[in-house]
Amino acid sequence: MEDADVYAISVEVAPRFLDDQSAPEDGRYAFAYTIRIHNQGRVAARLVARHWRITDANGRVEHVDGDGVIGEQPRLRPGEDFHYTSGVMLGTDHGTMQGHYDMVADDGTEFAAPVAPFVLAIPRTLH
């Protein structure tokens, strides 16, 4: 059995612009993102930390690290999902986020669950 089969976490992200919480004239653009974390592996694992790299349209990079997500360190059994929504404020109308979660399996193995880059952007209207 390969480690990839034993320790497999998938992450899906759905970002959205929060117009009512943004103030473009002040350089504040609010975005929410809903995350689905799915344990595709064969052993339960706990999400213990998060690591984000946030880049705005000017190339300014911010690193955000912390314990768990939204105040929790969820344990996912094989086949289980965990969903949460959080947010970020950018100084530009678009940017990207990417990162990973630190996971600890029930057998003590530590591994990373990558979060592929995703785009934060204001929806454009066509005229």
From Swiss-Prot:
**GO biological process per UniProt:** error-free translesion synthesis
Gene3D superfamilies the UniProt entry points to:
ApaG domain
Highest taxon listed in the record's lineage: Bacteria
Looking at the record, the residues that make up the ApaG domain are 3-127
The family database entries (InterPro entries) matched by this protein are listed as: ApaG_domain (IPR007474), ApaG_sf (IPR036767), Uncharacterised_ApaG (IPR023065)
Q: Which HAMAP family match?
A: ApaG
Q: Which NCBIfam families match?
A: PRK05461.1
Name of the protein described by the UniProt record? Protein ApaG
